[in-house]
Amino acid sequence: MLYCLSSRKLEIKMYKFKTKPYEHQKDALKKCWDKESFAIFAEMGTGKTKIALDNACILYNRGKIDRLLVVAPKGAYMTWVEQEISAHIPDYIEKEVLAWKLSTSQKYKEQLKLIRSVNDFRLKIFVMNVEALST
């Protein structure tokens, strides 16, 4: 569990991790959990994905976000969908995950509408590759 103390409201928040974080990941979360914006500059393999997902879950639990956009390199973005999200987001958080693809099918269009729709109390996660921004 991570206990965070907000200096503005002196509220203690509790978050139950799905996967146990290392100390440096806890330290990063303590620095970013209540910020409007932040960046994670860390070496490859240090758990930036876990930090980002845990932070998104903390914000979701606090009612600060209801959607998450993940932009990753083409060779890595499907790893978020196939492995990382289910590995790190706690099971008690209901979520809807959609990966970007170049498709005109009616089913995919309906899924896109769902991701963009009003909040139905699920964390909506849209994952895309950075190269798609240039197409």
Q: How would you describe each model-predicted region?
A:
Residues 2-40, 46-135:
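SF2 helicase/translocase NTPase motor core
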